[in-house]
Amino acid sequence: MAEKVYIYDTTLRDGSQMEGVSFSLEDKIRIAEKLDDFGIHYIEGGWPYANPKDNLFFQKAKKMNFKNAKLTAFGSTRRPNKKVSEDPQVESLIKAETPVVTIFGKSWDLHVTDALKTTLEENLNMIYETVEYLKRYVDEVIFDAEHFFDGYKSNPEYALQVLEAALKGGADWVVLCDTNGGTLPHEIYEITKKVKERFKDANVGIHAHNDSETAVANSLMAVLAGARQVHGTINGIGERTGNANLCSIIPNLQLKLGFDVIPQENLKKLTELANFVAEIINMPLPRNMPYVGESAFAHKGGVHASAVLKNAKTYEHINPELVGNKRKITVSDLAGRSNLVHKLKEFGIEIDPKSPELKKLIDKIKELEKEGYHFEAAEASLELLIKRHFGLVKDYFDFDAYRVLIAKRRDDSLPTSEATVRLSVEGVEEHTASLGNGPISALDRALRKALEEFYPNLKELQLIDYKVRIINESAGTSAKVRVLIESTDGKRKWGTVGVSENVIEASWIALRDSIVYKLMKDEEEGIL
């Protein structure tokens, strides 16, 4: 039977310390529910004493029914030279009424003398007394040995005495923290092994930060050395360069090292979970993130794609479906017939690989990419291009003209933008105008306003991202630009692209494709 490794998620506390991340109370509740559903064992909800929002979260969480996770409150040891029962910070941990409390304490002698301004002996007393006191009120106490690896390298005997004080106080887990993120994997392994040799029966955990970009490797090495609890965050979010990324650690432990981590069927929810958290914090998931990124199983080169389609093991380390991701064969100027044949099948088009039509399509795509088009992030435009080539996209409207005006008067703080659009649907003409925050916003609003009377479903459409890139910078103000637009209707997301020497025209092309793609998909589903 596989050995168990317990996952301790600190997204709601350590993750919130990342620059640009701020969780609302509702965000925290939604993420906690998602983590529990996924099968996480411990969810660190926050620090009730330091943050009023965390206090509210723990009050709300009392009414939540966790089926897999133990909710955990986070805090610190008592203050120096103070009775533990009189420390309001410690009392706040008890009032949180969680089954588990995690406290951190100093394990680096430098921090004890220079940061805490107390003696090494008093620090040991603080740890022992706080753990012992909390054990009277909660089921489980986890002790985070802050800066443990730096402390061990500075004064190994004292760092071990810190763990001993926590264990004597009744700590259920002692967690070795690489707080500054500067320890390398071989050091993590050696030091964790020494800890396990010294405290054979102790439950040991690892808490790694990613400052040296080794947090995932450090976590795995600690487990190989005997640690059985791993701390981290979804997508590796956290202070400075982040925490250990649970989206890599969990599949590595379960699929590669054979540990029992979460229910196997839940592993398929990993990509969904990663995207959910990315959406909540409004930070796009990096395309190249291992296991869960959009490009994690993407194949661009023709040789690679051809081999993968014959046998996926040739260029994939796991089946992407195991983590809820999917294989992606991209079409680009590097792509060959295999890529395009596969993509056509995805779009429901069967074609002979030797067909002259396929050659024409490849040539067309390569010519467009030479002009500056880029379809890897704009699969909706690619699907429309292919289906138009085969006459499979109907004309949802006939475009006549658009005009965009930008005006600023002397007394205006900001310019105003107005767009007019003239088009017809099945012979019925429509001429509309709209204002916007900028020219593209105005054009988008005018186009949708003209079409919504005929296609009410377009009210669901939202533009969620807009990027402009100069393709040939040396041309200065005459440079060609590529516009990428990401859209959603609440059910799906898609990307479209436009290229022109005029940014308004490039945006129009991408906007038009976004709307046509939405209408085409709705018609395919019978809801237009």
From Swiss-Prot:
Q: Which Gene3D superfamilies match?
A: 1.10.238.260, 3.30.160.270, Aldolase class I
Q: Source taxonomy lineage?
A: Bacteria, Pseudomonadati, Aquificota, Aquificia, Aquificales
GO terms of molecular function: (R)-citramalate synthase activity; 2-isopropylmalate synthase activity
The entry's protein name is (R)-citramalate synthase
The family annotation for this protein states: Belongs to the alpha-IPM synthase/homocitrate synthase family.
> CDD domains annotated for this entry?
DRE_TIM_LeuA3
Keywords in alphabetical order, please. Amino-acid biosynthesis, Branched-chain amino acid biosynthesis, Isoleucine biosynthesis, Transferase
Keyword Transferase included in the entry's annotation: yes
Q: Show where the Pyruvate carboxyltransferase domain sits.
A: 5-271
Does Iron appear among the keywords?
no
User: Any transmembrane segments, and where?
Assistant: none
Single biological process term from Gene Ontology: isoleucine biosynthetic process
Q: Which Pfam families match?
A: HCS_D2, HMGL-like, LeuA_dimer
Biological role stated in the UniProt entry? Catalyzes the condensation of pyruvate and acetyl-coenzyme A to form (R)-citramalate.
| Top-level taxon of the source organism | Bacteria
